[in-house]
Amino acid sequence: MTVTRVVDTSCRLGEGPVWHPDEKRLYWVDIESGRLHRYDPETGAHDCPVETSVIAGVTIQRDGSLLAFMDRGRVGRVVDGDRRESARIVDSPTRFNDVIADPAGRVFCGTMPSDTAGGRLFRLDTDGTVTTVETGVGIPNGMGFTRDRERFYFTETEARTVYRYAYDEETGAVSARERFVESPETPGLPDGMTVDSAGHIWSARWEGGCVVEYDADGTELGRFDVPTEKVTSVAFGGPDLDSLYVTTAGGDGDGSAGEGDESTGDAAGALFRLDVAATGRPEFRSDVRLG
Protein backbone atom coordinates (compact mmCIF):
# COMPACT_ATOMS: atom_id res chain seq x y z
CA MET A 1 0.00 0.00 0.00
CA THR A 2 1.24 3.48 -0.87
CA VAL A 3 -0.08 6.82 0.36
CA THR A 4 0.26 10.01 -1.66
CA ARG A 5 -0.56 13.56 -0.66
CA VAL A 6 -2.32 14.81 -3.77
CA VAL A 7 -3.66 18.26 -2.85
CA ASP A 8 -2.26 20.59 -0.17
CA THR A 9 -5.52 22.13 0.97
CA SER A 10 -4.85 22.58 4.72
CA CYS A 11 -8.56 22.15 5.42
CA ARG A 12 -9.74 23.05 8.88
CA LEU A 13 -12.31 20.27 8.61
CA GLY A 14 -12.03 18.45 5.30
CA GLU A 15 -14.95 16.06 4.81
CA GLY A 16 -17.41 14.39 2.47
CA PRO A 17 -15.39 13.22 -0.57
CA VAL A 18 -17.49 12.07 -3.52
CA TRP A 19 -16.42 11.08 -7.04
CA HIS A 20 -18.34 12.70 -9.91
CA PRO A 21 -18.16 10.21 -12.80
CA ASP A 22 -19.53 12.64 -15.40
CA GLU A 23 -16.86 15.24 -14.67
CA LYS A 24 -14.20 12.72 -13.65
CA ARG A 25 -13.43 14.90 -10.66
CA LEU A 26 -13.47 14.47 -6.90
CA TYR A 27 -15.47 16.89 -4.75
CA TRP A 28 -15.07 17.43 -1.02
CA VAL A 29 -15.70 20.20 1.50
CA ASP A 30 -13.93 22.19 4.16
CA ILE A 31 -16.85 22.57 6.53
CA GLU A 32 -15.50 25.34 8.74
CA SER A 33 -14.05 27.40 5.89
CA GLY A 34 -17.22 27.02 3.82
CA ARG A 35 -15.36 25.83 0.73
CA LEU A 36 -16.33 23.27 -1.86
CA HIS A 37 -13.15 21.75 -3.32
CA ARG A 38 -12.77 19.79 -6.55
CA TYR A 39 -9.81 17.93 -8.01
CA ASP A 40 -9.10 16.51 -11.46
CA PRO A 41 -6.64 13.60 -11.10
CA GLU A 42 -5.89 13.54 -14.82
CA THR A 43 -4.63 17.13 -14.96
CA GLY A 44 -3.87 17.74 -11.29
CA ALA A 45 -6.10 20.84 -11.36
CA HIS A 46 -7.72 21.89 -8.10
CA ASP A 47 -10.08 24.76 -7.36
CA CYS A 48 -12.86 25.91 -5.02
CA PRO A 49 -15.96 26.73 -7.08
CA VAL A 50 -18.08 27.63 -4.05
CA GLU A 51 -17.18 29.62 -0.94
CA THR A 52 -19.88 30.33 1.62
CA SER A 53 -20.31 30.42 5.40
CA VAL A 54 -20.67 26.67 6.01
CA ILE A 55 -20.86 23.70 3.67
CA ALA A 56 -21.01 20.29 5.30
CA GLY A 57 -21.43 17.84 2.43
CA VAL A 58 -22.71 17.28 -1.09
CA THR A 59 -24.51 14.64 -3.10
CA ILE A 60 -24.54 14.31 -6.88
CA GLN A 61 -27.95 14.77 -8.43
CA ARG A 62 -29.08 12.59 -11.32
CA ASP A 63 -28.84 15.60 -13.65
CA GLY A 64 -25.18 16.09 -12.67
CA SER A 65 -25.68 19.10 -10.40
CA LEU A 66 -24.88 18.95 -6.68
CA LEU A 67 -26.98 19.27 -3.56
CA ALA A 68 -25.05 21.22 -0.92
CA PHE A 69 -25.98 20.71 2.73
CA MET A 70 -25.14 23.75 4.85
CA ASP A 71 -26.17 25.12 8.26
CA ARG A 72 -29.49 25.94 9.98
CA GLY A 73 -31.22 23.25 7.97
CA ARG A 74 -30.41 24.80 4.60
CA VAL A 75 -29.82 22.84 1.40
CA GLY A 76 -28.82 24.44 -1.91
CA ARG A 77 -28.03 23.44 -5.47
CA VAL A 78 -24.68 23.85 -7.20
CA VAL A 79 -24.93 23.99 -11.00
CA ASP A 80 -21.80 24.30 -13.15
CA GLY A 81 -19.86 25.43 -10.11
CA ASP A 82 -22.36 28.16 -9.11
CA ARG A 83 -24.50 27.96 -5.98
CA ARG A 84 -28.15 28.54 -6.79
CA GLU A 85 -31.32 28.64 -4.72
CA SER A 86 -31.48 27.15 -1.25
CA ALA A 87 -34.31 25.87 0.93
CA ARG A 88 -34.60 25.19 4.64
CA ILE A 89 -35.65 21.57 4.98
CA VAL A 90 -35.45 21.18 8.78
CA ASP A 91 -35.55 23.48 11.79
CA SER A 92 -32.05 23.18 13.23
CA PRO A 93 -29.76 25.65 15.01
CA THR A 94 -26.73 23.62 13.93
CA ARG A 95 -25.17 22.47 10.69
CA PHE A 96 -25.46 19.28 8.74
CA ASN A 97 -22.67 16.71 8.96
CA ASP A 98 -22.35 13.60 6.77
CA VAL A 99 -24.85 13.00 3.96
CA ILE A 100 -25.46 10.18 1.47
CA ALA A 101 -27.87 9.49 -1.38
CA ASP A 102 -29.74 6.21 -1.35
CA PRO A 103 -30.50 3.92 -4.32
CA ALA A 104 -33.88 5.62 -4.94
CA GLY A 105 -32.56 9.20 -4.95
CA ARG A 106 -33.37 10.13 -1.36
CA VAL A 107 -30.74 11.61 0.97
CA PHE A 108 -29.92 10.56 4.52
CA CYS A 109 -28.47 13.58 6.32
CA GLY A 110 -27.33 14.12 9.89
CA THR A 111 -27.29 17.33 11.94
CA MET A 112 -24.89 18.13 14.74
CA PRO A 113 -26.03 18.32 18.37
CA SER A 114 -26.81 21.67 19.98
CA ASP A 115 -26.43 22.86 23.56
CA THR A 116 -29.93 21.64 24.34
CA ALA A 117 -30.48 18.60 22.12
CA GLY A 118 -28.63 15.73 20.52
CA GLY A 119 -27.85 15.34 16.87
CA ARG A 120 -30.43 13.94 14.50
CA LEU A 121 -30.55 11.80 11.39
CA PHE A 122 -33.10 12.70 8.71
CA ARG A 123 -34.26 11.23 5.43
CA LEU A 124 -34.93 13.77 2.68
CA ASP A 125 -37.29 12.23 0.13
CA THR A 126 -37.30 13.05 -3.57
CA ASP A 127 -40.40 15.25 -3.24
CA GLY A 128 -38.71 17.36 -0.56
CA THR A 129 -40.48 15.88 2.46
CA VAL A 130 -38.37 15.07 5.51
CA THR A 131 -38.62 12.18 7.97
CA THR A 132 -36.77 11.99 11.29
CA VAL A 133 -34.87 8.70 11.52
CA GLU A 134 -32.86 9.06 14.75
CA THR A 135 -32.68 11.60 17.59
CA GLY A 136 -30.30 12.03 20.51
CA VAL A 137 -27.25 11.22 18.41
CA GLY A 138 -23.82 12.26 19.71
CA ILE A 139 -22.21 13.02 16.35
CA PRO A 140 -23.92 11.56 13.25
CA ASN A 141 -21.32 10.45 10.75
CA GLY A 142 -20.45 8.07 7.89
CA MET A 143 -23.13 6.04 6.13
CA GLY A 144 -23.37 3.37 3.45
CA PHE A 145 -25.34 0.47 1.99
CA THR A 146 -24.63 -3.22 1.60
CA ARG A 147 -24.16 -4.62 -1.90
CA ASP A 148 -27.61 -6.20 -1.89
CA ARG A 149 -29.18 -2.87 -0.82
CA GLU A 150 -30.89 -4.58 2.10
CA ARG A 151 -28.84 -3.03 4.92
CA PHE A 152 -27.91 0.55 5.84
CA TYR A 153 -24.84 1.56 7.85
CA PHE A 154 -24.72 4.60 10.14
CA THR A 155 -21.75 5.75 12.23
CA GLU A 156 -22.20 7.39 15.62
CA THR A 157 -18.79 8.79 16.43
CA GLU A 158 -19.09 9.41 20.16
CA ALA A 159 -20.49 5.90 20.69
CA ARG A 160 -17.49 4.51 18.75
CA THR A 161 -20.00 2.41 16.85
CA VAL A 162 -21.10 1.67 13.30
CA TYR A 163 -24.73 0.55 13.38
CA ARG A 164 -26.48 -1.58 10.79
CA TYR A 165 -30.19 -1.42 9.96
CA ALA A 166 -32.61 -3.29 7.75
CA TYR A 167 -33.30 -1.01 4.77
CA ASP A 168 -36.35 -0.91 2.49
CA GLU A 169 -35.37 0.57 -0.88
CA GLU A 170 -39.00 1.08 -1.91
CA THR A 171 -39.94 3.25 1.08
CA GLY A 172 -36.55 4.37 2.43
CA ALA A 173 -37.47 3.08 5.88
CA VAL A 174 -34.77 1.71 8.17
CA SER A 175 -35.43 -0.58 11.14
CA ALA A 176 -34.00 -3.28 13.41
CA ARG A 177 -30.87 -1.37 14.39
CA GLU A 178 -27.95 -3.50 15.55
CA ARG A 179 -24.35 -2.82 16.50
CA PHE A 180 -22.23 -3.79 13.52
CA VAL A 181 -18.78 -2.63 14.68
CA GLU A 182 -17.83 -1.40 18.14
CA SER A 183 -14.29 -0.13 18.36
CA PRO A 184 -13.42 0.98 21.90
CA GLU A 185 -9.81 -0.14 21.51
CA THR A 186 -9.16 0.93 17.91
CA PRO A 187 -7.09 4.12 17.62
CA GLY A 188 -9.26 7.19 17.15
CA LEU A 189 -12.99 7.53 16.63
CA PRO A 190 -15.01 6.23 13.66
CA ASP A 191 -15.83 9.06 11.26
CA GLY A 192 -16.70 8.91 7.55
CA MET A 193 -16.94 5.61 5.68
CA THR A 194 -17.54 3.95 2.34
CA VAL A 195 -18.41 0.46 1.09
CA ASP A 196 -16.34 -1.13 -1.69
CA SER A 197 -17.31 -3.46 -4.52
CA ALA A 198 -16.67 -6.51 -2.33
CA GLY A 199 -18.96 -5.20 0.40
CA HIS A 200 -16.10 -4.28 2.72
CA ILE A 201 -16.39 -1.20 4.93
CA TRP A 202 -13.63 1.42 5.00
CA SER A 203 -13.85 3.59 8.13
CA ALA A 204 -11.83 6.78 8.64
CA ARG A 205 -10.47 7.28 12.16
CA TRP A 206 -10.65 10.77 13.66
CA GLU A 207 -7.50 11.34 15.75
CA GLY A 208 -6.45 7.80 14.89
CA GLY A 209 -4.29 8.55 11.84
CA CYS A 210 -5.62 5.62 9.84
CA VAL A 211 -8.37 4.01 7.79
CA VAL A 212 -9.71 0.64 8.98
CA GLU A 213 -11.09 -2.02 6.62
CA TYR A 214 -13.79 -4.46 7.79
CA ASP A 215 -15.41 -7.34 5.96
CA ALA A 216 -19.18 -7.66 5.63
CA ASP A 217 -19.32 -9.53 8.96
CA GLY A 218 -17.56 -6.73 10.84
CA THR A 219 -14.20 -8.48 11.14
CA GLU A 220 -11.24 -6.11 10.95
CA LEU A 221 -9.07 -6.88 7.92
CA GLY A 222 -6.43 -4.18 8.13
CA ARG A 223 -5.38 -0.68 9.12
CA PHE A 224 -3.89 1.77 6.66
CA ASP A 225 -1.86 4.64 8.08
CA VAL A 226 -2.33 8.23 6.94
CA PRO A 227 0.42 10.73 7.85
CA THR A 228 -1.79 13.00 9.93
CA GLU A 229 -4.03 12.31 12.92
CA LYS A 230 -7.44 13.76 12.03
CA VAL A 231 -8.60 11.42 9.28
CA THR A 232 -12.20 12.31 8.47
CA SER A 233 -13.64 10.45 5.48
CA VAL A 234 -12.97 8.24 2.46
CA ALA A 235 -14.28 7.67 -1.07
CA PHE A 236 -13.18 5.61 -4.02
CA GLY A 237 -12.49 7.61 -7.16
CA GLY A 238 -10.78 7.62 -10.51
CA PRO A 239 -12.18 6.27 -13.79
CA ASP A 240 -11.92 2.71 -12.48
CA LEU A 241 -12.79 3.61 -8.87
CA ASP A 242 -9.50 2.07 -7.76
CA SER A 243 -8.07 5.01 -5.79
CA LEU A 244 -9.13 5.52 -2.19
CA TYR A 245 -9.23 9.27 -1.50
CA VAL A 246 -8.94 10.38 2.12
CA THR A 247 -9.90 13.75 3.58
CA THR A 248 -8.30 15.13 6.73
CA ALA A 249 -8.60 18.04 9.16
CA GLY A 250 -6.47 20.21 11.40
CA GLY A 251 -5.08 22.69 8.88
CA ASP A 252 -5.35 26.45 9.09
CA GLY A 253 -7.81 26.73 6.22
CA ASP A 254 -5.59 28.95 4.09
CA GLY A 255 -5.53 26.46 1.21
CA SER A 256 -1.99 25.13 1.45
CA ALA A 257 -0.75 22.41 3.77
CA GLY A 258 2.60 22.45 5.48
CA GLU A 259 5.69 21.43 3.56
CA GLY A 260 7.55 19.67 6.34
CA ASP A 261 7.89 15.98 7.20
CA GLU A 262 4.46 14.40 6.80
CA SER A 263 5.02 12.18 9.83
CA THR A 264 4.97 15.27 12.08
CA GLY A 265 1.42 16.16 11.09
CA ASP A 266 2.35 19.02 8.78
CA ALA A 267 0.04 17.45 6.19
CA ALA A 268 -3.03 18.15 8.32
CA GLY A 269 -6.00 19.07 6.17
CA ALA A 270 -4.57 17.69 2.92
CA LEU A 271 -6.25 15.29 0.50
CA PHE A 272 -4.54 11.90 0.26
CA ARG A 273 -4.78 8.92 -2.06
CA LEU A 274 -4.29 5.37 -0.85
CA ASP A 275 -3.48 2.71 -3.43
CA VAL A 276 -5.18 -0.34 -1.95
CA ALA A 277 -6.18 -3.71 -3.36
CA ALA A 278 -9.85 -2.76 -3.65
CA THR A 279 -12.26 -0.94 -5.92
CA GLY A 280 -15.31 1.11 -5.15
CA ARG A 281 -18.86 1.27 -6.44
CA PRO A 282 -20.49 4.25 -8.18
CA GLU A 283 -22.15 6.52 -5.64
CA PHE A 284 -25.92 6.59 -5.68
CA ARG A 285 -27.30 9.89 -6.96
CA SER A 286 -29.87 12.06 -5.29
CA ASP A 287 -33.01 13.15 -7.15
CA VAL A 288 -34.46 15.69 -4.75
CA ARG A 289 -36.70 18.61 -5.67
CA LEU A 290 -36.18 21.65 -3.45
CA GLY A 291 -38.81 24.25 -2.71
From Swiss-Prot:
Its cofactor is a divalent metal cation. Keywords: Arabinose catabolism, Carbohydrate metabolism, Cobalt, Hydrolase, Magnesium, Manganese, Metal-binding, Plasmid, Xylose metabolism. Binds 1 divalent metal cation per subunit. Most active with Co(2+), Mg(2+) or Mn(2+). Has weaker activity with Fe(2+), Ni(2+) or Zn(2+). Monomer. Its EC number is 3.1.1.15, 3.1.1.68. Pathway: Carbohydrate degradation. The active site is at 191 (proton donor/acceptor). Belongs to the SMP-30/CGR1 family. SUPFAM superfamilies: Calcium-dependent phosphotriesterase. It comes from Haloferax volcanii (strain ATCC 29605 / DSM 3757 / JCM 8879 / NBRC 14742 / NCIMB 2012 / VKM B-1768 / DS2). A divalent metal cation binds at residues 15, 141, 191. It comes from the Archaea. Pentonolactonase involved in D-arabinose and D-xylose catabolism. Catalyzes the hydrolysis of both L-arabino-gamma-lactone and D-xylono-gamma-lactone to the corresponding acids. Can also hydrolyze D-galactono-gamma-lactone and D-glucono-delta-lactone. One of its GO terms (molecular function) is L-arabinonolactonase activity. It holds the Pfam family SGL. Disruption phenotype: Deletion mutant shows restricted growth on L-arabinose but grows on D-xylose as the wild type. Induction: Transcriptionally up-regulated by both L-arabinose and D-xylose via the pentose-specific regulator XacR. It catalyses: L-arabinono-1,4-lactone + H2O = L-arabinonate + H(+); D-xylono-1,4-lactone + H2O = D-xylonate + H(+). This is Pentonolactonase XacC. InterPro entries: 6-blade_b-propeller_TolB-like, SGL, SMP-30. GO terms for biological process: arabinose catabolic process; D-xylose metabolic process; L-ascorbic acid biosynthetic process.
